């Protein structure tokens, strides 16, 4: 029976890893559909190459930073327990690689290709796993300190703060340091509209992310005996709550409608194993509303050129999710309990601070040394031609 359990657990978390791997296709198509046509190829290449760099760096360094586990041992040892430790790495890698995928959407259309790969390596190798180890592996006694002060540890079941807020708040200084796209904001206060190049591809990306998210959340149990249907239904309710709120506040704009469910899913990650489904519905709806309001403010009033709105979507909604777990996870509101508002607030603030610090340092150093932004001419030509020497839809085919 023990051998059967080991095999089942390995299969369970492997399937979770595959589902979250598929989410990276969602990131790619969401960005492809949002950027202008001259940057579509770049969106696709960035996500795949960022994932590849993340895999190598997380395997060699990042996973060890977070969990103290090294893979510099024989294959016989790695294959023990049906290779469970390896597929657990695969599953958690897909989370780590989401950080540069999130950032990619914010800095789209004008960021240099190679400096961003360096940023990916540093963030996935050190910045992200440092905080991951604090929350999910009890590093440095931070969780014990939060528990001593508040009575409960900081709870983040599937990464509202550890993954999403981390990605969104690292992206904010990256976007600010990079600066806006040329001619995006005019001296007279006018804003040049850059509508999505393909609503169908944007919607496809959203749907791929939505489906994969059930692996992201449910499989965060990491073993089959800990699986919970509550996580699945709470994810569902938060998703539809975010959709409906974005529909109403976004006045039926298809971009908002297809980002609303993602906002809800970002927010529910932390407390999806604790909340009542009605609580998850409210959390998702608040997140959908937050995204619409904050995206509009950042783009139009604050002149922050965050192309996909990754700071509102992942940063703000992720932070809301971390705090919301301490509200709607409470037994007084139908949740399972074992959490409190103060602990959640402390953990969330710590995550936001670390992400901002990491983002400022990584992108600040890169801006000073290598530069972050394409030239005006390169940006005008588009990243597809500038970086990859081909467009998504060439005007003519080569005659063979």
What does each model-identified segment do?
Residues 1-400:
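Hydrophobic alpha-helical transmembrane bundles of multi-pass membrane proteins
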């Amino acid at each position: 029976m023990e051998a059967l359990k080991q095999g089942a657990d390995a299969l369970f978390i492997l399937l979770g890893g595959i589902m979250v791997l598929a989410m990276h296709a969602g990131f790619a198509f969401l960005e492809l559909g949002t950027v202008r046509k001259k940057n579509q190829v770049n969106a696709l290449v960035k996500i795949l190459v960022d994932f590849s760099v993340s895999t190598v760096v997380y395997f060699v360094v990042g996973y060890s930073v977070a969990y103290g586990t090294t893979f510099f041992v024989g294959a016989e040892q790695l294959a023990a327990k049906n290779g469970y430790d390896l597929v657990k790495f695969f599953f958690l890698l897909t989370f780590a690689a989401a950080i540069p995928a999130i950032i990619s959407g914010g800095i789209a259309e004008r960021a240099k290709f190679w400096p961003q790969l360096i940023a990916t390596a540093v963030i996935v190798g050190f910045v992200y796993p440092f905080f991951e180890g604090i929350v999910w592996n009890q590093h440095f006694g931070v969780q014990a300190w939060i528990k001593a002060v508040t009575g409960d540890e900081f709870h983040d079941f599937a990464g509202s703060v550890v993954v999403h807020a981390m990605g969104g708040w690292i992206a904010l200084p990256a976007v600010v340091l990079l600066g806006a796209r040329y001619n995006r904001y005019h001296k007279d206060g006018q804003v040049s509209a850059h509508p999505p190049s393909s609503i169908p591809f944007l919607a496809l990306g959203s749907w791929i992310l939505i489906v994969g998210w059930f692996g992201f959340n449910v499989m965060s149990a990491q073993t089959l005996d800990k699986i919970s249907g509550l996580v699945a239904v709470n994810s569902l309710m938060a998703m539809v709550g975010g959709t409906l709120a974005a529909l109403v506040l976004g006045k039926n704009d298809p971009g908002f409608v297809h980002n609303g469910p993602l906002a809800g899913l970002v927010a529910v990650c932390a407390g999806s194993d604790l909340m009542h489904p009605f609580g998850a519905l409210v959390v998702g709806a608040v997140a959908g509303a937050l995204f619409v309001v904050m995206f509009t403010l950042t783009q139009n009033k604050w002149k922050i050129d965050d192309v996909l709105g990754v700071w509102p979507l992942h940063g703000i909604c992720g932070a809301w999710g971390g705090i919301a777990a301490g509200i709607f996870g409470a037994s007084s509101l139908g949740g399972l309990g074992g959490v409190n508002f103060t602990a959640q607030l402390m953990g969330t603030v710590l995550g936001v601070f670390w992400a901002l610090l990491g983002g400022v340092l990584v992108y600040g150093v890169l801006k000073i040394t290598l530069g972050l932004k394409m030239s005006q001419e390169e940006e005008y030509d588009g990243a597809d031609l500038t970086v990859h020497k081909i467009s998504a839809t060439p005007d003519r085919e080569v005659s063979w």
